[in-house]
């Protein structure tokens, strides 16, 4: 019985998705903005941008959004929104116009990844 219980606990920890949550939008001194999300662990991320309508799309695989996100912000960011379905979290950054942007990075902090 203990072996079965141990196996089920191990299996449930393996099945548990990587939880992701919105953290902050921060303006930098060099007229750029940084949008941060927190992850439990490192994930595969695919990102791309669209010109019309102007937006940046970030897909975080094997993840589950803690709660829906819809954050309005100042120029050039119109709205940051996110949702999850089937272990995929999609983050969409709606923009007033096309901007130069950098691919997302993952950094370890005290709060998570």
Which ranges hold each PLM region?
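Short linear recognition/processing motifs and adjacent strand/loop elements at protein termini
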Residues: 2-8, 15-113
